[in-house]
Amino acid sequence: DGGVFAEITYGKVPALSRFKFLVIYGDPAPGENKTKKSSTKTVCLLGKLAGRLYLIKTFLDRGLNAEFVEWYIKLLEFVGGKTTVYCYMENNKLQDPFFQQVFQPIVRRIRRERKISLYITGDEEKKTDKATRIEANLEPLNREGNLILNEAEKDNPHMKRMAEQFKLFN
């Protein structure tokens, strides 16, 4: 165990309609395979209410790029129009060609084929080291019991993997 996130708090998520908005955020590991050596991709549905950050639902697995985009759709369907949702994807300078040449065409194709409104904005904000950001932003919330993982998703393999990622963090 890493120690930074020794305890994980699970709790009931308020009705989605109570959130002013929700964010779907994805981190697309490079690669187009499901082997044990490939990196994991993740897409999370997050909401903040009354000082608490809720991890409402997540997908965390090795997978294909089209599956990664499909996770956004599943999360949008889960919200079901109960509140506004903003969709973002990690997109630093190194990832931008991948975002433009691989993900955007997949999103456009799916939007056209399914006649759905799916728009993912690349998060191009220059950031510090990921580990530093996690420790600085999420650890204090977690320590105070204000980082809440959805108890209804506790047995979901994706949420289990996310909780494990937190516990391994050091």
Show which residues each predicted segment covers.
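Short regulatory "switch" loops immediately downstream of catalytic or recognition motifs
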Residues: E7, G31, I106-V107
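Structured core elements
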Residues: I24-Y25, L45, Y88
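Short, conserved, surface-exposed binding loops centered on an aromatic residue
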Residues: G11-S17, E32-K37, K74-G81
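ATPase catalytic-site recognition across NTP-hydrolyzing enzymes
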Residues: D1-P28
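Short, well-ordered turn and helix-capping elements at secondary-structure junctions
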Residues: P28-E32, F59, N170
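Mg2+-dependent endonuclease catalytic cores in nucleic-acid-processing enzymes, primarily RNase H-like
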Residues: L49-F169
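Flexible internal linker/loop segments at domain or repeat junctions
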Residues: V13-R18, G47-L53
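An active-site-proximal beta-strand-loop segment
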Residues: G26-V43
